[in-house]
Amino acid sequence: MINRDDPDFWANLVDVVAQGTWQTLYMVFVALLFTVVIGIATGVLLVTTEEGGLYAKPFGSRALGKATNRVLDVVVNIGRSIPFIILMFLLIPFTRFVVGSFIGPTAAIVPLTIAGIPFFARLVEIAVREVPRGIIDAAVSLGATKRTILFKVLLAEAIPALTLGLSTTVVGLIGYSAMVGAVGGGGLGDVAYRYGYQRYSLEYMLVVVVLLVLLVQILQSVGNYVARRTSHR
């Protein structure tokens, strides 16, 4: 149990929480980087490889397009259906293979990324589907290439929805990072567990909760602001 009368109590709290905050930001935003790159590609393929889609016949083969669409859909559904706490333990051998360890902030990036990709991919799919068909048809009638339609029509028009999806994903990853911390992943979750729970320090627990709430509010507000600024409506 932590002694609140210790003259170094608050100084130690600040140091521990600062380190935990840095670890949380590190694991969340590195995981987010991989999540965004792979998630956008996956979400776009889910839309463009379906019947009548932009890449419904990759390399001239509808069978390949259909197979790609079905495989990605199944993988995304499986990824979203596994509870994160189970996914963490399931990925321990893979995490150890990739990083060399299954504990610490760097190791936590692996399960965070794998959990984030299917979640964000589905949000990307929804955002791209919301692009009016008339805009796509107009681009096709003007002779735009598939690449132009993809980047300058589909993704460009979907930016507001993608931004909201991104902020939602970040919030989800922050929540996941707290769970990772409770099993040795570091970050604010680790601080709350080791100091707030195991050592019965209400001060540590409250500071962690306040920081997590502030972090979520700030990131969500930024996402909402960017979405409003980029909306054409």
Language model features: what each stretch is:
Residues 1-32, 57-70:
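Periplasmic/extracellular loop-to-transmembrane helix junction in inner-membrane transport proteins
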